Amino acid sequence: MPELPEVEVTRQGVSPYLIDNTVTDLIVRNPSLRWPVPEIAKQIIGQTIRNVRRRAKYLLIDTDAGTTIVHLGMSGSLRILPATTPAEKHDHIDLVLASGKALRFNDPRRFGAWLWCELPEQAHPLLSKLGPEPLTDAFNAPYLLESLANKKKAIKLCLMDNHIVVGVGNIYANEALFAAGIHPQAEAGKVDAERIEILVSEVKQILAGAIKQGGTTLKDFTNADGKPGYFAQKLHVYGRGGKTCTQCGHMLSEIKLGQRATVFCSLCQQR
């Protein structure tokens, strides 16, 4: 599933082709995504794209008339192609531009979304209750310590809670907790301030590193020019259950936590 770095890499890749370009058509081949593509989404036709932003794992395409909200779901990707390129299987939507290019949305599993918002996007139900962005100053140790106070849930589940901090999905939660030496099942409210400070720092470093490497490609993700991300080559725990710890050589444990694969080193990561 594309996480924050993958969505940010996509934003960086498509932005130069979209900003200041006028939309000439919106071709919807299959509206049956996670939510049906609304007919109102075609209000973008004739509009000039003013900006392309990211909020959590959502891509926001701004025009004067409103904002297109795109979510890549489990297997979605966006690519810039000549508008005349024949559509292939799972190419569900084309945003056609006056430049002769098109932003093409491909989603084999159809868990993604293509929506339209005329209100300030902060008021949209999908965006209104999101926590701070992890790469901003708003996500800091005092904030996280206060947010976790008295919480009995596992720290990993809290780290993946978009109401607390956005965009830290399963891959990067596993990696950040390993780097910080925190057991993923540790009770969130009992993790001390020193380790929370380390965790915040590691979350920021790991996400920034993943963006620099073009995201993590495990199966479906490619960036806007069709190339894979290379951060998978730097993963220490995610997807490595039963293999040796890169730090101490002990065998990595794998469990299910919140129905998600969770890999950790029982020696390096203490409760």
Swiss-Prot record:
InterPro entries: DNA_glyclase/AP_lyase_DNA-bd, DNA_glyclase_Znf_dom_DNA_BS, Formamido-pyr_DNA_Glyclase, FPG_cat, MutM-like_N-ter, Ribosomal_uS13-like_H2TH, Znf_DNA_glyclase/AP_lyase, Znf_FPG/IleRS
One Pfam family recorded for the sequence: Fapy_DNA_glyco
Cofactors required: Zn(2+)
Zinc finger annotations (FPG-type) as residue ranges: 236-270
Cofactor details (free text): Binds 1 zinc ion per subunit.
GO BP of this protein: base-excision repair
Gene Ontology terms, MF aspect: 8-oxo-7,8-dihydroguanine DNA N-glycosylase activity; class I DNA-(apurinic or apyrimidinic site) endonuclease activity; damaged DNA binding; zinc ion binding
Keywords: DNA damage, DNA repair, DNA-binding, Glycosidase, Hydrolase, Lyase, Metal-binding, Multifunctional enzyme, Zinc, Zinc-finger
Active site per database record: 2 (schiff-base intermediate with dna), 3 (proton donor), 57 (proton donor), 260 (proton donor)
Gene3D superfamilies: 1.10.8.50, MutM-like, N-terminal (3.20.190.10)
The protein's Enzyme Commission number: 3.2.2.23, 4.2.99.18
Quaternary state and interactors: Monomer.
Function according to Swiss-Prot or TrEMBL: Involved in base excision repair of DNA damaged by oxidation or by mutagenic agents. Acts as a DNA glycosylase that recognizes and removes damaged bases. Has a preference for oxidized purines, such as 7,8-dihydro-8-oxoguanine (8-oxoG). Has AP (apurinic/apyrimidinic) lyase activity and introduces nicks in the DNA strand. Cleaves the DNA backbone by beta-delta elimination to generate a single-strand break at the site of the removed base with both 3'- and 5'-phosphates.
Family membership: Belongs to the FPG family.
Family annotation (HAMAP family): Fapy_DNA_glycosyl (MF_00103)
Name of the protein in question: Formamidopyrimidine-DNA glycosylase
Protein source organism: Shewanella pealeana (strain ATCC 700345 / ANG-SQ1)
